Amino acid sequence: MNDICCIGHITLDKIVTPKQTAYMPGGTSYYFSHGISHLKDTKHYKLVTALAPTEFKAVEDIRAKGIEVKVIPSRHTVYFENIYGENQDNRTQRVLAKADPFTVEQLKDVEANIFHLGSLLSDDFSLDVVKYLSGKGTLAVDAQGYLREVRGKKVYPVDWTEKTEALKYIDILKVNEHEMEVLTGHKAVSYTHLRAHETRSKLV
């Protein structure tokens, strides 16, 4: 059994700046796996991802670093377009393609002590997937994807519609200050505020 399993889409990112346009792989699961690859022991880690065959080179690069990868076929790869102005803090983001969401059936043969869900968009992981994985091990979730919804090609900030129920099954929740404010409705937030949502989260 693996100690840690990260589940999430590897993306194709189009980065547009006033000086150049570049294409590169990305996504929480991609960078998480590259971070793990710098540790001495990678044999107890596994990545589960879903992407189209056109982006399989990103998987090959990760495997070349000694990481075990399970690829779930998808009709498309998540394709982000990030446009930056002269001020790099100003970014316009669009989603030009979405991958298929993960399902319980696809994850039945995946075993680990800790699962980390690298969500990128609000429909990557259903509540059923969250419930299922919470019964198999410690569940950690990156909240950012649940707070982003795609309409057309534009990305809109949204609240996590099923957060009250989902947070009951999550042991570790990764959020930044803005995400915590969206989840709790408080600018000056604390662990106590999140507990008000009846979570089982031990770490935030």
Predicted features by range, described:
Residues 22-35:
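Short catalytic helix/loop segments, enriched in acidic residues and glycine
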Residues 192-199:
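Conserved small/polar residues in nucleotide/adenosyl-binding loops
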